[in-house]
Amino acid sequence: MGFYQGPDNRKITGGLKGKHRDKRKYEIGNPPTFTTLSAEDIRIKDRTLGGNFKVRLKYTTTANVLDPATNTAKKVKILEILETPANKELARRGIIIRGAKIRTEAGLAVVTSRPGQDGVINAVLLKNESQRS
């Protein structure tokens, strides 16, 4: 079932607006993909407008972490999700989004990609935090 993202049929007062056209296919959206930690990586391939595809990351175990000091990237295991600036409930539920702070085998990192839309988790290692962990 799609999520309708078009204009609402209610006025501010609560009354119904007059319907001047039908719903369009391009106004249909999808529910959010909540990427969480799991034993294996599971990706969902969705068809989007124009026949293109969007790869959604549903479950993951690893992240591509860039070390700014050496300018090298490594694929490392994610240990836990520490915090999410957008919504603290997402971190509590273990959902990885862009901007989330994660603990990896390489140290603390911040997610820079959008896992629900890119199909991969890219992160940048935090400078002062990586020496502590």
UniProtKB/Swiss-Prot annotation:
Leader sequence residues: none
Alphabetical UniProt keywords: Ribonucleoprotein, Ribosomal protein
Keyword NAD among record annotations: no
Coiled coil: none
Annotated GO MF terms: structural constituent of ribosome
Cited Pfam families: Ribosomal_S8e
Annotated spans, Disordered: 1-31
Keyword Ribosomal protein: yes
Any one of the GO CC terms: cytosolic small ribosomal subunit
InterPro entries: Ribosomal_eS8, Ribosomal_eS8_CS, Ribosomal_protein_eS8_arc, Ribosomal_Se8/biogenesis_NSA2
Top-rank taxon: Archaea
GO biological process: maturation of SSU-rRNA from tricistronic rRNA transcript (SSU-rRNA, 5.8S rRNA, LSU-rRNA); translation
Known partners and oligomeric status: Part of the 30S ribosomal subunit.
Family classification: Belongs to the eukaryotic ribosomal protein eS8 family.
HAMAP family attached to this UniProt entry: Ribosomal_eS8
PANTHER family documented for this protein: 40S RIBOSOMAL PROTEIN S8
NCBIfam families in the record: eS8
Protein name from the UniProt record: Small ribosomal subunit protein eS8
Organism: Saccharolobus solfataricus (strain ATCC 35092 / DSM 1617 / JCM 11322 / P2)
